[in-house]
Amino acid sequence: MSAVDPIADMFSAIKNAIMRRDAFLYVPSSKMKERILEVLKREGFIQDWEALKGEKYEEEFKKMKELAEKSPNPKMRRYLQQLIDYNKGTQYPLKIYLKYLDPKKRRSALTNIVRVSKGGRRVYAGVRTMPYVKRGLGIAIVSTDAGVMTDHEARKLRKGGEVIAFVW
């Protein structure tokens, strides 16, 4: 993954994991990613997420190493490699548990996630110009001076800010 737009990389990793019908995935950490994941969890698009620091990382690494050695499934080796790659310097892996509405068909709660504000073109919206996503059925994730929140919460607090993504 490139370091040009880490948030877009996280969104791509989530979409790819949903297409593979994975139960969870790992992404490198950042404060902004943690805030975005908290909004996605609160709105019901993902089941949960956790930061794997210190002992949690060691436990997860042991578990994945054992599974990768026992299983011929290449998916386990990929997870193990991600754990190793994302635990460098001050970064640590974030484990995202995906949410599926129908366990048999594995239909995801998250249909699509689109990055709006990018490095080359920042998109800002005031209270009156805050976009509605899918006529109110989706959410816009907005970064305001009061923190990262949905478009509904931003309208309620009368705050504008940078539109990070559309989710439905």
UniProtKB/Swiss-Prot annotation:
Entry-linked InterPro entries: Ribosomal_uS8, Ribosomal_uS8_CS, Ribosomal_uS8_sf
SUPFAM superfamilies reported for this sequence: Ribosomal protein S8
Protein's GO biological process: translation
GO cellular component terms attached to this protein's record: ribonucleoprotein complex; ribosome
Protein name per Swiss-Prot or TrEMBL: Small ribosomal subunit protein uS8
Subunit structure: Part of the 30S ribosomal subunit. Contacts proteins S5 and S12.
Region of interest: Not found in other S8 sequences: 59-93
The keyword Transcription regulation appears for this protein: no
Keyword annotations from UniProtKB, A to Z: Ribonucleoprotein, Ribosomal protein, RNA-binding, rRNA-binding
Keyword Nucleotidyltransferase: no
Family: Belongs to the universal ribosomal protein uS8 family.
Role, per record: One of the primary rRNA binding proteins, it binds directly to 16S rRNA central domain where it helps coordinate assembly of the platform of the 30S subunit.
Molecular function GO labels: rRNA binding; structural constituent of ribosome
Pfam families membership: Ribosomal_S8 (PF00410)
Highest classification ranks of the organism: Bacteria, Pseudomonadati, Aquificota, Aquificia, Aquificales
Annotated organism of origin: Aquifex pyrophilus
